[in-house]
Structures are given as structure tokens and as C-alpha cells.
């Protein structure tokens, strides 16, 4: 184990890592990312399990853990979970949310890959990580019921391309989740329909996608997300050959991009994509 002085110096260095990395360019930046990742992992190993339980180290974990190294992320959330009471005494509910979010992402990635191992992560909701999931708190549905319903539906959609089964399962999910839902939940459901089944969606599926995306749009304030939902709705209307409605939503999306502040790059990319959709629409209308 490294001595404490050395670890204090490393902590200061790791806290400054994000702003330091922003200043690097090209090959240098890549080299530093690799070096900092190595330093970070050694630092975590030297202080695990209990010496990491403080605000500064939690900030370091949030900044540098990332999602690239799944094995290390699994180690990290298990480390937190094994000492969750201590973590929560120091930092409130945040570490529980971190565990839940990471486990949900693991389950989602597996389900979308059509890998039945997603079920292992769903089972952790009611056993290994039960306490963390309790903290998140739901009304009218248990965290396990929620996870099972959602990830079973997702797996079925991506693995079996069973759109009808997915729509039915998600309507049940939305019904049971009613008081816990966020706009993004509807948006993601619509997006998964496009991502998994895209070209094979029937007219009735596009109608469902429009309904979900409109619900998401009605409750969403973030400009990028609003633009995304408007374009999705426009795409569905285009597939339904309702070109007037498609144009209306594409134009709305374009107008929305004008409100993006200090974001020239994403603004230009979005506008060019929407213009392309509008010109494609003109060809279809001829």
C-alpha cells in the first residue's frame, strides 16, 4: 500500500485531471488518458475499500470511472455496495443511485445485444443490490418488478424483433409505473422501436411511436431532446405518408435548434440533418 502522503498528492492530481485533459491535444491527450486511467485504478486499489469513502474520492470516481472498462466498473459498484451504509452516511443517496444506474446500464446493454445474461443483472435488483434499489424508491411497483418488466420487453424486442409483444409490455409498464415516469421513459421506448425494428415497423407501430414521442415532448425542456423527439415524430409521419405533418414537425425541430445557446457545432449538425430530411420529403411528395 502506498503511504498516505503519496495518496494525498495523487488525490489532488486526479481531482485536477478533467481540466488538465481538456488542455491536451492529439497524441498527447491519448497518452495522458491512458496514464491517468492507470493511476486512477492503482489509487482506487490502494485506498479500497474504506479510505475511498469521502467526497473528493467520490468525485474522482464519478469523473474517471467511465463505462469503457466494464470489469472495473463492476468491481467499483460492488465495492460501494459492500459498504453502502458507510457511503450513504458520508454522501447521502448519491452512491445508491450510482449503483442502480450502473446495474441498469449493464442489464440494458445485454438485453439490446440479445444476450440472456441480462437476467443476471435483473436478479441483482432483488438480492445483491436490493438496498441500493430501495433507496431510489418507487410507488405502486417494486424495483424488481420494474426491472423485470422493462428488460424482458427490451430483450424480446431486440432478440426476437417482436414489436407487438414490446408495445404490449411497455403499455403495461407505463400503466404500473405511472407516478414514477419521466418524459425520457416515453422517449426511450419510442427510440428503441426505431433502433430495433426500424424499417419493419408497420403503420400501427408508427402511430404508437408518435404517441410515446409526443408524451415525451410535452414534458421535456432540454432543447436537444426536444429536437430529437420532433424529428422522430416527423420520421414516423413520413413513413405514414402524412407528408404535411412530417414537414410541420421537421420545421418545428429546425426552429427549436435556433434556441441552442453557445453550441455552434451541434446546432450546425442538427440543422444540416433536418434540412436533408426536408429535401428528401420534397422528393417523396413529387
Show which residues each predicted segment covers.
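Preference for long, solvent-exposed alpha-helical segments and helix-linker "stalks"
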Residues: 1-187, 203, 260, 273, ...
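Residue-level recognition of tetratricopeptide repeat
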Residues: 155, 191-198, 235-238
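TPR/Sel1-like alpha-solenoid repeat signature
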Residues: 212, 230-237, 249
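Boundary/linker segments of alpha-helical solenoid repeat arrays
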Residues: 178-185, 221-226, 256-271
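Terminal, low-structured helical/coil segments at or just beyond the last alpha-helical repeat
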Residues: 248, 252-286
Amino acid at each position: 500500500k502506498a503511504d498516505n502522503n503519496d495518496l494525498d498528492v495523487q488525490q489532488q492530481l486526479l481531482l485536477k485531471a478533467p481540466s488538465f485533459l481538456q488542455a491536451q491535444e492529439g497524441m498527447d491527450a491519448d497518452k495522458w488518458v491512458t496514464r491517468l486511467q492507470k493511476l486512477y485504478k492503482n489509487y482506487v486499489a490502494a485506498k479500497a475499500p474504506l479510505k475511498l469513502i469521502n467526497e473528493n474520492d467520490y468525485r474522482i470516481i464519478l469523473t474517471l470511472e467511465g463505462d469503457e472498462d466494464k470489469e472495473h466498473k463492476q468491481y467499483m459498484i460492488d465495492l460501494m455496495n459492500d459498504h453502502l451504509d458507510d457511503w450513504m452516511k458520508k454522501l447521502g443517496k448519491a452512491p445508491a443511485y450510482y449503483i442502480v444506474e450502473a446495474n441498469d446500464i449493464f442489464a440494458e446493454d445485454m438485453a439490446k445485444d440479445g444476450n440472456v445474461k441480462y437476467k443476471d443483472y435483473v436478479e441483482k435488483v432483488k438480492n445483491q443490490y436490493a438496498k441500493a434499489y430501495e433507496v431510489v424508491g418507487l410507488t405502486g411497483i417494486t424495483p424488481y418488478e420494474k426491472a423485470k418488466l422493462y428488460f424482458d420487453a427490451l430483450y424480446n424486442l431486440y432478440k426476437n424483433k417482436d414489436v407487438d409483444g414490446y408495445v404490449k409490455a411497455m403499455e403495461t409498464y407505463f400503466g404500473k409505473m405511472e407516478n414514477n415516469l419521466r418524459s425520457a421513459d416515453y422517449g426511450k421506448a419510442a427510440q428503441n422501436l426505431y433502433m430495433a425494428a426500424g424499417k419493419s415497423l408497420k403503420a400501427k407501430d408508427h402511430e404508437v411511436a408518435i404517441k410515446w414521442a409526443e408524451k415525451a415532448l410535452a414534458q421535456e425542456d432540454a432543447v436537444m431532446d426536444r429536437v430529437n423527439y420532433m424529428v422522430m415524430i416527423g420520421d414516423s409521419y413520413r413513413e405514414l405518408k402524412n407528408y404535411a405533418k412530417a414537414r410541420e414537425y421537421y420545421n418545428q425541430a429546425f426552429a427549436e435548434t435556433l434556441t441552442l445557446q453557445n453550441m455552434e457545432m451541434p446546432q450546425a449538425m442538427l440543422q444540416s440533418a433536418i434540412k436533408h430530411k426536408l429535401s428528401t420529403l420534397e422528393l417523396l411528395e413529387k
